[in-house]
Amino acid sequence: MQPASLDRLDWQIIAMLSENGRTANSTIGDKLGVTEGTIRQRIRRLMEVGVLRISGQVNPEFLEGHQLLLVGINIGESSQLMKVFERLGQLPEVKSVAILSGRYDLIIQVVVESNHGVIKFLTESLASIEGIRATETFIVLKTHNYWL
């Protein structure tokens, strides 16, 4: 994906929506000194090119009965990095995937139901992906200012 060219107004709109994704276009326009139509067009363009997505987020503290995991992953061969990256992103339990420098090649954020779900994810879903050499799983016990 080619990075989109963003100007100051785009960044201001993104900042306001990051604070509250439900802010009315007219309110954003009033604060930034442009029309509601300009804001609407900018938001539509940002969404079409894949820069912006507006969605609800959940505080993981309220996911009773669920486990939030961070899993560090090392791959066997660097030529498989993108293939493993893409495959991880297709797993329904995986909320995000990142390529890293440092100790791990990749890290994933995972939400599963119960401890049984942890075992099932690790031994079935994750184990089915070719190219993974080793993993280290961290069960998140508490978060602060962290949303899914």
Regions found by a protein language model. Give the residues of each.
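A compositional/biophysical signature of low hydrophobicity enriched in polar/charged and small residues
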Residues: 1-148
